[in-house]
Regions:
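Conserved beta-strand/loop scaffold segments within soluble protein domains that form the structured core
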Residues: 1-175
């Protein structure tokens, strides 16, 4: 089975000063191909658990967009289970929100799995964007590629003007 168009799932925040919890599971049957876009937006506090089960020889592409309102707090765990000779392409883009924490894990269930985790973030002054990843290579002949890139935009007049460059007095400044 091949899904020709991306499946777009929009997750709206619960609203200012409101908390909500979610759980989403996306399963691909063996030999299936699909792309899923998770579009996060709105305000409030939202915590969720997202599971990706990629069957044997299946191919799943995920794009997770975190473009929350300035007051939003989002704590999310993305867990991927990758089958024999299966392919996972996970792309995370974090742009908005007050605090965004994404914890991603990949577990290979059989030999030959292939996972690529790509991330991009752009943080303004005062934003906390955190991505923590773990790829468990517990099966033979599996491969992974993890690349995260980001840009920080801050106000040098803040109480931590050297935060983006290290601490010069400790010899940690970057030139």
């Amino acid at each position: 089975v091949e899904v020709a168009e991306p499946i777009v799932i929009t997750i709206d925040g619960p609203g200012a000063d409101t908390v909500a919890y979610g759980h989403l599971q996306i399963r691909l049957a063996p030999f299936a191909r699909a792309a899923v876009v998770l579009d996060h937006r709105g305000s409030g506090t939202y915590a969720d658990n997202v599971e990706f089960v990629v069957g044997d020889s299946a191919h799943l592409t995920v794009v997770a967009i975190h473009d929350w309102a300035d007051d939003a707090v989002h704590v999310t765990a993305h867990h991927a289970s990758v089958g024999r000779d299966a392919v996972l392409r996970h792309n995370a883009v974090s742009l908005g929100g007050d605090l965004i924490r994404l914890t991603g894990t990949v577990r290979y269930n059989a030999p030959g799995g292939d996972a690529e985790l790509l991330g991009l973030y752009f943080a303004d002054d005062g934003q906390h964007l955190e991505h923590r990843l773990l790829v468990d290579h517990s099966q033979p002949n599996c491969k992974s590629n993890v690349v995260y890139k980001g840009a920080l935009q801050g106000d040098p007049a803040t109480d931590r003007p050297d935060a983006q460059f290290g601490l010069p007095e400790a010899g940690l400044g970057l030139m």
